[in-house]
Amino acid sequence: MALWGGRFKQEADAKFKFFNDSLRFDYRLALQDIDGSIGWAKAITSVGILTEQEHQQLVVALKELRAEIEPNIAIILRDDAEDIHSWVESKLIEKVGDLGKKLHTGRSRNDQVAVDMKMWCKVQAVVLQERIRNLQHKLVETAEANQNAVMPGYTHLQRAQPITFAHWCMAYYEMLERDFSRLTDAYKRMHTCPLGSGALAGTAYSIDRDALAQDLGFAIGTRNSLDSVSDRDHVLELLSTASISMVHLSRFAEDLIFFNSGESAFLELSDRVTSGSSLMPQKKNPDACELIRGKSGRVFGALSGLLTTLKGLPLAYNKDMQEDKEGIFDAMETWQACLEIGALVLEDINVNVERTREAAQQGYSNATELADYLVAKGIPFREAHHIVGEAVVYAISKREPLEALSVAEFKQFHPVIDEDVYPILSLESCLEKRSAKGGVNPERVREAIEAAKVNLGA
């Protein structure tokens, strides 16, 4: 039976019922709905709505219900209730009879779903931080194992300057650290409890909302009932953080796809995260990475969809807000899966250090070193830049790297160039010179790895 049937003389059309009902997706809020109900039972007992005996009877029944569904909350889907609130109430009534009908006193589904969603989002933030940390651990482990793997760094997908695979790994560690921080910040703003705000104007019972908030794991009750039942900022913040993180994961995946390609051959992905072709027996496709890259669109879409849904809503609650759920549920599952698969991809990755070094020696990625060499000889950088550009054109015409040019050839471009230029042009010199904080100098990279291990508690 619907929770609101008294006003209506006709039953809802079956098509509308399916269109309106949300149990098929909001069943995921079952544990939060039960926990919120336990907290609410205590709150209304404090103002005399329930006796202490009734309170205890309800709490026992709610805890029993929680224990029954916790191993597999999907069993709820066998039911035909309108939503998770209706389902919990109906099951409670089955257990305690008419006493179960007293629980909703002073409460609206508007503040009920608001607190359910906020509690669910808090749980998700913690779980996702754990998944981020796991991927960061894998990145640090991979970096530590590949500190000597010199490879080309790219701008515009063209070889630019030499880096190491370890430095590449640590770049993604830093991106994920910002994602972790964003979740921490978002979690702080989830510490206000909307329960007790009623439908929009507040509850008619003088409950202690701050005590209720603390019972439910919040810091304090919200300050404005209109805002409380209308607020979905916590959902938007999770979706926003997920979207930014999925940008990072998509770029991570794209890099690995490129490095794994036959054109690069910098590394090989494990058989555990690749698949074959139904037609071409030689293929080994980077499907795990391609799916991470592809699934980013689902998460972006959830954020865009909810922003669009909320932007024109008047205060307070509107049924449009039911559309916050499917997007966030799917986005959080997708983000979590991508973080887990990203870590799996790194487990058995095999970097071809000979090939990465060979590639780093190509493409004139030491040209900047030659320009810096000229600057050290007293030539203004802009002039040095032009001189080196001409030298590169000459080397390209000879199909030789810069370091293969003779001193006499170098002197065609400027007389200050001498024998001391050759050590400067080596890959090792290119790396060593980048010794400022954050640079690719091997010692700086080692320091970054050690700092990350301390941060991760490794």
Swiss-Prot record:
GO biological process, one term: arginine biosynthetic process via ornithine
Enzyme class: lyase
Compartments in which it is found: Cytoplasm
Any GO CC annotation of this UniProt entry: cytosol
Enzyme Commission code: 4.3.2.1
Record pathway: Amino-acid biosynthesis; L-arginine biosynthesis; L-arginine from L-ornithine and carbamoyl phosphate: step 3/3
Chief site of localization: cytoplasm
PROSITE patterns: FUMARATE_LYASES
Recorded catalytic activity of this chain's protein: 2-(N(omega)-L-arginino)succinate = fumarate + L-arginine
Any one GO MF annotation of this record: argininosuccinate lyase activity
Keyword tags: Amino-acid biosynthesis, Arginine biosynthesis, Cytoplasm, Lyase
The keyword Transmembrane helix belongs to this UniProt entry's keyword annotation: no
Protein family membership: Belongs to the lyase 1 family. Argininosuccinate lyase subfamily.
Protein name, per record: Argininosuccinate lyase
